[in-house]
């Protein structure tokens, strides 16, 4: 069994902290929360400290933040129904674009692998795809409305321009651009959860997806492409996603976030029972029937709900978490 070792506990935000995001280089991260501010933290020696506070971009809670793949831009999604784009072109971070269009709170934001596309989703049940049209210019490429409820999360595929979204309607949906007419379409609906799907994340090559839900389970989904050797039918030559594993019994309350480490293959969960749990694929796992085991759990990782967890993209086994308790914690997993 592994261990989750606490390395740092950080404070600075007022109120609950909703989101944390590692910079692609892994030596800086950003945090956001109820206080309408974004904090950018960096490591000096062995001490993490706030380097910058961005407090003039939003009028309400900031729900999520994400760095662009190049690390030059930061996008923030807010309950004020806008998404702000920040960059450091002049030496200091400033808000260079504000994306408007959603009718209600923006819940999530995600950059595509190339950084040329941005996705947002909202309580208004819609998913928007934006194209980067030039310096600080973004054009709406699609407004997608297949969900019947609040959309909680959007995440781009790590190697393709394929988008996944998770919703209060208990489903996950996949979107891709039709090559003929360049229209964005919903290409798959993933149904198995029995309550809100809070979080989703792809594995390193994007052939599998993990989801977490209010139903206290995590599920592993596998992509079956046209011509697959497993004999899974693919109507209309579209990739089919099947739930190949359900992990249940470890969480006592809603699971709010899940992160699939691209370096180690470990899965981390953030739970409403104040805990963080780490899962690993077993050595005898089969492609069409994978099995995962919990290798460690920190039951009282925070004093209140854990809202977000994210693996460091560079430092293997380093995990960051944030909570309603107003703290950010940095952990190290030892297997």
From Swiss-Prot:
Keywords assigned by UniProt, alphabetized: Repeat, WD repeat
Top-level lineage group: Eukaryota
Pfam family, one: WD40
Tagged with keyword Repeat: yes
SUPFAM superfamilies documented for this protein: WD40 repeat-like (SSF50978)
Entry's transmembrane regions: none
GO biological processes: iron-sulfur cluster assembly; protein maturation
PROSITE patterns: WD_REPEATS_1, WD_REPEATS_2, WD_REPEATS_REGION
InterPro entries with a match to the protein in the record: CIAO1/Cia1, G-protein_beta_WD-40_rep, WD40/YVTN_repeat-like_dom_sf, WD40_repeat_CS, WD40_repeat_dom_sf, WD40_rpt
GO cellular component assignments: cytosolic [4Fe-4S] assembly targeting complex; metallochaperone complex
Keyword Lipid biosynthesis: no
WD repeat intervals: 12-51, 57-96, 101-140, 146-185, 192-231, 250-289, 301-335
Job of this protein: Essential component of the cytosolic iron-sulfur (Fe/S) protein assembly machinery. Required for the maturation of extramitochondrial Fe/S proteins.
PANTHER family: CYTOSOLIC IRON-SULFUR PROTEIN ASSEMBLY PROTEIN CIAO1-RELATED, WD40 PROTEIN CIAO1
Family: Belongs to the WD repeat CIA1 family.
Record protein name field: Probable cytosolic iron-sulfur protein assembly protein Ciao1
Source organism (scientific name): Drosophila sechellia
Lineage summary: Eukaryota, Metazoa, Ecdysozoa, Arthropoda, Hexapoda
Gene coding for it: Ciao1
């Amino acid at each position: 069994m592994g261990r989750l070792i606490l390395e740092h506990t950080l404070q600075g935000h007022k109120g609950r902290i909703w989101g944390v995001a590692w910079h692609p280089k892994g030596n800086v991260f950003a945090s956001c929360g109820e206080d309408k501010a974004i904090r950018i933290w960096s490591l000096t020696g062995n001490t993490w400290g706030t380097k910058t506070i961005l407090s003039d971009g939003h009028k309400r809670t900031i729900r999520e933040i994400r760095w662009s793949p190049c690390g030059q831009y930061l996008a923030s999604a807010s309950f004020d129904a806008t998404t702000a784009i920040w960059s450091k072109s002049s030496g200091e971070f400033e808000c260079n674009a504000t994306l408007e269009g959603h009718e209600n709170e923006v819940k999530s934001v995600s950059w595509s692998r190339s950084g040329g596309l941005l996705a947002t989703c909202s309580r208004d049940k819609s998913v928007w795809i934006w194209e980067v049209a030039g310096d600080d210019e973004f054009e709406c490429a699609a407004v997608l409305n297949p969900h019947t409820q609040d959309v909680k999360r959007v995440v781009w595929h790590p190697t393709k321009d394929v988008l996944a979204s998770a919703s209060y309607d208990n489903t996950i949906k996949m979107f891709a651009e039709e090559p003929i007419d360049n229209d964005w379409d919903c290409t798959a609906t993933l149904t198995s959860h029995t309550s809100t799907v809070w979080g989703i994340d792809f594995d390193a090559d994007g052939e599998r997806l993990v989801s977490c839900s209010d139903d206290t389970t995590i599920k592993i989904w596998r992509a079956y492409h046209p011509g697959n050797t497993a004999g899974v039918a693919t109507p209309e030559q579209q990739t089919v996603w099947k739930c190949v594993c359900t992990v249940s019994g470890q969480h006592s309350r809603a699971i709010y976030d899940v992160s699939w480490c691209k370096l180690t293959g470990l899965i981390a969960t953030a739970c409403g029972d104040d805990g963080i749990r780490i899962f690993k694929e077993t050595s005898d796992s089969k492609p069409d029937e994978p099995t995962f085991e919990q290798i460690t759990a920190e039951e009282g990782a925070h004093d209140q709900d854990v809202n977000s967890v994210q693996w460091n993209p560079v430092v293997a086994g380093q995990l960051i978490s944030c909570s309603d308790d107003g703290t950010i914690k940095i952990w190290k997993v030892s297997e």
